[in-house]
């Protein structure tokens, strides 16, 4: 049977992040992708110029349509900017007995804010207890824990432990913004702390990296891969996609990663 994954996220008109990046990732990894759109963004490699939220009612209707027909094996949640939307998503997950990969998208790669302040508490209170794994970057982890942005791996670990106390099953704190030759993420499931290093890649093409990573984790879970293995494989896929990104030459700003690097010829 074909593995199916669902992305609940915003649409990126430039195609590099959000729903578009998620569906590309699912396809690249051999998983059928379904989608629930939470917002429509006017966005390109240079930034976000406008955001139109989709109503909570339509978000619920999309979830009902997908879950009532498709045998969804994994769910990934990305951009959800409104408290009402978060409540609708949490309700849908509970009704259909689903947990999710939660990418707490708060700030775009360009630096534009994507999550309203009153929605941060709702995300922590309603979505994190339903998370199989939550994947914050350093700024998001700091915002979620009320601490300063981590400057080293020891503080990353402390913030991972704090996020676990929200009820999440596991946490992956992404350390790509730390200084150094490595981009090291920390995975914590309440018992074991796993260090996941990778060589740092110097490139302007890093738009949608967080979306791609969380979608790749969901793709692995949809195929029945254990969580830590899905996380490790997703990080390897993202690293390869970033390494190949310069071949695309898309946009005038921070371009997308190369989701189909294994298949497209130069």
Swiss-Prot record:
GO terms for biological process: thiamine biosynthetic process; thiamine diphosphate biosynthetic process. Gene3D superfamilies: 3.40.1190.20. It is an enzyme of class 2 (transferase). One of its GO terms (cellular component) is cytosol. It catalyses: 4-amino-5-hydroxymethyl-2-methylpyrimidine + ATP = 4-amino-2-methyl-5-(phosphooxymethyl)pyrimidine + ADP + H(+); 4-amino-2-methyl-5-(phosphooxymethyl)pyrimidine + ATP = 4-amino-2-methyl-5-(diphosphooxymethyl)pyrimidine + ADP. Belongs to the ThiD family. This is Hydroxymethylpyrimidine/phosphomethylpyrimidine kinase.
